[in-house]
């Protein structure tokens, strides 16, 4: 059964947050990024996402959740950045709080 965006977001949080060691875990969900196969999530250290501290930047893969399977996976960030099938829409109910 396909997962909703909200279910996918919680899967990502449950997968990454408990063992996060680089700064304070942050899932920036102000935008919903997706294509027909998966949701894309922006996670990282709050110190980088909010404060702009480059020493907390993480380079490499981007977490995704496969819609049909509900499985957390990853894709290279360059692949995600250049994938024309990925759509971006403002999230009407973000959990992200910048303050």
Where are the regions a protein language model picked out?
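Short, non-transmembrane alpha-helical segments in secretory-pathway proteins
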Residues: 1-27
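N-terminal targeting sequences that direct proteins away from the cytosol to non-cytosolic compartments
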Residues: 2, 76-79, 99
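Exposed beta-strand-loop-beta-strand "reactive/processing" segments of non-cytosolic proteins
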Residues: 26-67
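A short, surface-exposed interaction/processing loop segment used at functional sites
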Residues: 59-89
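Short, solvent-exposed cationic patches
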Residues: 88-99
């Amino acid at each position: 059964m396909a997962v909703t965006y909200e279910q996918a977001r919680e899967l990502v949080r449950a997968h990454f947050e408990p063992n996060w060691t680089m700064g304070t875990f942050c899932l920036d969900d102000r935008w919903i990024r997706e294509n027909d196969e998966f949701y894309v999530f922006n996670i990282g250290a709050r110190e980088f996402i909010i404060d702009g501290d480059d020493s907390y930047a993480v380079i490499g893969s981007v977490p995704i959740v496969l819609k049909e399977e509900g499985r957390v996976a990853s894709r290279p960030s360059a692949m995600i950045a250049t994938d024309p099938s990925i759509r971006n829409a403002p999230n009407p109910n973000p959990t992200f709080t910048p303050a």
